[in-house]
Amino acid sequence: MAEVIAITKQRPLNQFERDSLIKRFEFTYEMAWKLMMSYEKDNGVIGLAGSKDVVRQAFSLSLIDNGDAWMEMIDDRNRTTHIYDEEMAADVIDEIIHTYHPLFVELENRMDQLAKK
């Protein structure tokens, strides 16, 4: 995902690159919430019923700082399944670049810190 985002600093993305960025976002989102769920289960949290529950719990455990942005990410991830127009795709891509990618990086850094303890 970072590679495609870096291209946006040089020029507009072509259709293939936009599609690639959205697909990489979808994969990264799935890995991120499942990583949070695994961490929570390893720490005795039970009864989680999906990504929204997992994100709420991750916020309460301080795995993530911006719970609202993660909830918006869930909504946008669900929207990517039904993107049929360029305007909607452009909106989601803007969020991926400016909001969601930094959130993934923050989660990665937090998990790295926890792994070193």
Where does each model-flagged region fall?
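Solvent-exposed interaction patches of small proteins and small membrane subunits
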Residues: M1-K117
